[in-house]
Amino acid sequence: LRHLLDTRQPDGGWRCEKYFFGRGPETDYSNPLPTLAALDAFRFTPLVNAEPALDRAVDFLLAHWVLRKPIGPCHYGIGTLFMQVEYPMRGYNLFMYLYVLSFYSRARKDERFLEALHALQSRLREGQIVVERVVPKLAGLSFCKKGEKSEPATERYREILKNLEADE
């Protein structure tokens, strides 16, 4: 854990050092997906909601919601693919973004998080998550059929809502 905290970038996030698309001003940023993955790991530790460095990482991801443009060496952006609900969660997308950030009180109180949550809620069908993008090798499984409601995904959505109740 100490190594992760010590390797954060000045903007609060984490990054990989693979420059698939070359270098430019956008590559000075951290990468959103590694930052989200690190926060996902830290949510299982006593440092969640107690470590200021994690607040900076949360702030970095919330700022990306507004910035939206592709950033970091791997050029993660918030566009059409990001907005598609992917289940099981594995990439940088709206559902995973909200799920992980929902464990952080700093995010739950932020209008950018709430705006992102509203965007996810606008995609619900009868209060359930509809899978819009599938991990190709899992496409045959019943719980993650493209265009269909998914009970396991909806359970993750309910966890987001439960996490929001922690601040009430």
How should each PLM-predicted stretch be described?
Residues 2, 6-56, 60-115, 130-167:
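An alpha-helical repeat/solenoid feature that recognizes helix-turn-helix modules
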Residues 121-126, 133-134:
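Catalytic-face loop-and-helix region of soluble metabolic enzyme cores
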